[in-house]
């Protein structure tokens, strides 16, 4: 190719390249404009996207909260599954994850999260309860861990001020029942054979556990659920304090406990005794009073004790479950027995109106019911019968059976009952067998010696023991002495009926037995007293009128034609013959009570109709005229009347 062609080509190429460069420049300018426009569009888009992202962030926050609640629910269910598998440590770790979850700013979400945290803490405490009551060794470390968890729960409740789940009070109440359960198989008045060391540890834990919630008692408010929770806390603290002092110090009759009892039973404007207390609290009050009687043979606050018995019996009667719990029935029957025994010592009028043997029958049945319930509880083993309470129940049953058997035609040996057979061979039953034999044979001094072998019962069963002595003396008087002697001095009878040298029988005691036997128509043999010579005559041959002028002899002095003796009799005649029952029926003591006897005398005195006196001239003459020293007797009457004036 020639140079011109080459130059042309170069020229054309250069032109093309120039054109391309020009076009490139034009395109660059266009691109700059487009970039500016694009940047402006992008900035607007960025703003829109930022707003959208902010909106999505806010929406994502609530979605995240929803997811947290779902997560808490899943973790909670997993923890409960592990709990059912008895994998307590792993379950506790899962519940702790819920408790330590982050709290967000949304009020609604916080409330939901707080609810889950509260439920997780409740489950942690209940897990600990299962570990505590099933773990044999190393329980002390576990107790400290539970108290730490309890402190966490207490602080959490103070922080949220109960402003969460409406069931918070019920959940707390249930938790208190789990960690501070009822003591149904041990009694405050029967702790001789309990494992004290183990029980003190449990009671001490319950006391420290409930102390963590004392602040709730100071929280004001009239919410029924809050007041119910406060009542439960107050009750649990009272029970723990009483048990702790009983096990450690032995004495529960302190000002501290007395003040707590006053708070527990006091009626106020918000609630009554029945509303403030339930079966558990009244059960503890009854045990407290039973223990008081066991120590002193006396109940100081009888009114409150009776109120507790009635309320306790009413609660049990309304529930078939409660009526089948042997522990509760033992407390109920023991309370009733103690109240009757204390009433006898106090001469309670309400019990004075009750027939004596009916009351003894009631006591015997209740003693037997207690023995049956103790048998069901497995507490009639020989090792248990050494306690004061078991001796009290066994002896009470045997003693009341002896009293009733003495007047009954059906002779049922109390040692034949299955509940007594279980204890045969124990020292207390051997002593009771000797007591029963001596009573049956009316060996009074040996009877006293046998009863003296159980001195711990001489106070709590003093009333029944004195009844046994009195009944034994009465039976010996009528079954042995009266049938053997026709005449015997009072002093000789007293020596035969002597129980012991320390418990001497007096002359008045013997006369009381004789007079009561007449009034109750229990004198087997007719007897007559000669109090001038202190002699007692036994036998029907002594049925002779004591006055020299019997009513038959007085009637013989009246002529057959004088039929209207009452009309013609003078006042002094009437007073004389009335003493020998000529015109009026005599007032008899037999078959009458003391009250009936004196009422009859009063009625005779007030309603007597005096005869008309026709002749007043011989009023100073004492009739019948043949009576010796009648004039002297009249002088004595006048002298007495003058002195009375």
Curated annotation (Swiss-Prot):
It is found in: Cytoplasm; Nucleus. Residues 1-63 are annotated as: Disordered. Keywords: Cytoplasm, Nucleus, Signalosome. The keyword Nucleus applies. GO terms for cellular component: COP9 signalosome; cytoplasm; nucleus. Residues 1-45 have a biased composition (Acidic residues). Residues 46-63 have a biased composition (Basic and acidic residues). GO terms for biological process: adaptation of signaling pathway by response to pheromone involved in conjugation with cellular fusion; cellular response to pheromone; conjugation with cellular fusion; protein deneddylation; regulation of protein neddylation. Residues 348-543 form the PCI domain. The keyword Cytoplasm applies. InterPro entries: PCI_dom (IPR000717). Component of the COP9 signalosome (CSN) complex that acts as an regulator of the ubiquitin (Ubl) conjugation pathway by mediating the deneddylation of the cullin subunit of SCF-type E3 ubiquitin-protein ligase complexes. The CSN complex is involved in the regulation of the mating pheromone response. Component of a COP9 signalosome-like (CSN) complex, composed of at least RRI1/CSN5, CSN9, RRI2/CSN10, PCI8/CSN11, CSN12 and CSI1. In the complex, it probably interacts directly with CSN12. Present with 1320 molecules/cell in log phase SD medium. This is COP9 signalosome complex subunit 10. It comes from Saccharomyces cerevisiae (strain ATCC 204508 / S288c).
